[in-house]
Regions:
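Conserved AMP-binding/adenylate-forming
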Residues: 46-91, 207-210
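Conserved AMP-binding/adenylation subdomain of ANL enzymes
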Residues: 179-205, 212-279
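Gly/Ser/Thr-rich phosphate-binding loop
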Residues: 252-256, 266-334, 436
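Conserved ATP/PPi-binding loop(s) of AMP-dependent carboxylate-activating enzymes
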Residues: 341-342, 356-387, 401-402, 416-420
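Conserved C-terminal "lid"/linker of ANL adenylate-forming enzymes
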Residues: 412, 470-526
Length: 526
């Protein structure tokens, strides 16, 4: 299978209908499925000439923010035969170089030139802005590209620095299979279908506030086209723009990360004095019937509020390596750990500490199935996955019900869905070796947290050690800043290797009721 199938079943499914609505200033514009397909062909013919002498099968990076024709550029590259790597537009230059080395990327379609020697840079605005009549009307200069070259692979990358970011490759059949599986779940869920406002699915507009290069944002857009829904672009990705668009354009479904939902809750409380059904209708409109949260875990307080919002709220779980995997209504189970049931035809097992696999219980979630990633790009070559995938996440499986309990790997997932690696943050605070008997950073309550046993515990906040912590923290990127600090009178526990036992910190906090200081770093200008 090639990505022609995905195009045919998504944008091709919107012929005769509006596929996208967007804004130029305050003016709303529409793009039909027919017009989008025509523009894809024009961009394909243009790129076929522009990308010479790159051969079909070459990896090309699409590194640009969300835009109306972002998917069109991707499909045009694929129709030329190029395998596409989807990158964050904000990635630093070092990460671009990393993927050139590790993935063999030969060109970037981007809004910011990389300037990497020997690598082609193409401005995405140049591609998106081609004139359909000019390109399609000049077959001599821009020979038509047929359907005989379609690419069969796409790559998504994980968060991290140059040493941890990985490029995961998915076969076209895995992506198409996922889209079909999600559609089957969606159309078979009576709680969703009974909330339709019209027989015309085009009127059920969907607003998605995730970057398209993110596997969740990618899959949701193509899935809603697959089901016949119009996708609407807000004027910008800010929370107030999303609120205004949702209300004014009668959005029916919205997909966001937990951080965005928490923002809506705060704004509803500030504007209307509450977060009940009436307040949410005032904030987001009466047509919003279905909401989805994914990318990170919803906190218990948000779940409590959202249960009373009068809108069907779904929680979803997935990873870059597996795409989307589970989904379920937050009102279907009293546990805030509940993330629904498997619906992407994954085969799931629990790996216990003794190395045995069971169908039910608590342990590391292990998945297999066709819709997982196929390979990783390392050193310019594909290293293929062998056997099931160990997620690194602790789950409880109880029949068809799934409960996400936390991470057994060190990565911290913020409520915006971003991966933060504590080992990287530890390096910034290595001066603590001179001021303490031990320290580490870890994820605690979805926050970047510093644990330290200072030599001067009693006067810790007046010491040079604490002043240096504040100074270093102030210079860190916003997403890596420590937001909470725990100082311990007694030494921190260590592993058999003599390292601070990062994974035991949550348990240590529960057990040590004395000799612990909690210091919130927010509001300290750090």
């Amino acid at each position: 299978m090639h990505f022609q199938t995905l195009l045919d079943e998504t944008i091709g499914n919107m012929t005769g209908h509006t596929a996208i609505e967007y804004f130029v200033g305050k003016e709303k514009k529409k793009v039909s499925g027919d017009a989008y397909l025509t523009h894809i062909q024009a961009m394909t013919n243009y790129l076929n000439q522009r990308m010479q002498p790159l051969e079909p099968g070459t990896w090309v990076a699409l590194k640009a923010p969300n835009s109306i024709y972002w998917f069109g550029v991707m499909f045009a590259l694929m129709k030329c035969g190029y395998r596409v790597m989807l990158l964050d537009a904000q990635n630093p230059h070092q990460l671009d170089e990393h993927f050139v080395t590790e993935a063999g990327v030969k060109a970037f379609i981007t809004n910011r030139p990389t300037g990497i020697p020997g690598v082609m840079d193409v401005d995405i605005a140049e591609v998106e802005g081609v004139d359909d009549q000019e390109i399609l009307g000049d077959p001599t200069s821009y020979p038509p590209v047929g359907d005989d070259r379609w690419a069969d692979k796409v790559s998504f990358h994980t968060s991290g620095t140059t040493g941890t970011a990985k490029a995961y490759v998915f076969a076209a059949s895995a992506i198409v299979g996922t889209v079909r599986n999600v559609t089957e779940y969606w159309l078979g869920n009576d709680r969703i279908t009974e909330r339709r406002i019209s027989p015309n699915l085009e009127e059920h507009k969907s607003l998605l506030a995730l970057p398209f290069r993110h596997i969740s944002g990618f899959l949701l857009v193509v899935t809603f086209w697959h089901m016949g829904h119009c996708v609407i672009f807000p004027p910008n990705s800010g929370v107030f723009s999303i609120i205004d668009t949702c209300k004014q354009e009668n959005i029916w479904m919205m997909f966001c990360v937990p951080a965005m939902w928490k923002g809506f809750i705060r704004i509803a409380q500030a504007r209307y004095g509450g977060c009940g059904e009436q307040e949410f209708q005032q904030l987001l409109g009466e047509n919003l019937k279905v909401r989805i949260s994914s990318g990170a875990k919803l906190d218990a307080e948000s779940v409590k509020v959202l249960l009373n919002s009068g809108i069907y709220f779904l929680n979803s779980w997935g990873m870059t390596e597996i795409g989307t995997s589970t989904m379920g209504g937050i009102d279907e189970d009293p546990s805030t750990d509940y993330v629904g049931c498997f619906y992407n035809k994954h085969k799931a097992k629990i790996l216990l500490e003794d190395g045995t696999y069971v169908d039910n219980g608590v342990g590391e979630l292990v998945l297999d199935g066709h819709s997982l990633y196929e390979s990783i790009l390392i050193g310019g070559k594909e290293v293929f996955r062998e056997g099931p995938f160990r997620s690194g996440d602790i789950f409880k499986l109880d029949g068809q019900r799934t409960y996400f309990l936390g991470r057994c790997k060190s990565v911290i997932v913020t409520d915006s869905g971003e991966n933060i690696y504590p080992e990287e943050i530890d390096v910034y605070f290595d001066f603590l070796n001179d001021y303490s008997s031990g320290y580490c950073t870890a994820g605690y309550q979805d926050q970047v947290t510093l644990f330290v046993s200072p030599k001067d515990y009693d006067n810790f906040e007046e010491t040079e050690c604490f002043a240096q912590i504040r100074k270093v923290n102030a210079g860190l990127p916003m997403n890596k800043k420590v937001t909470k600090l725990y100082a311990f009178r007694d030494p921190l526990p260590r592993t058999g290797k003599g390292e601070v036992a990062r994974f035991q910190m949550a348990k240590v906090l529960e057990e040590r009721t004395d000799g612990v200081k909690e210091i919130k770093m927010k509001g300290r200008n750090v």
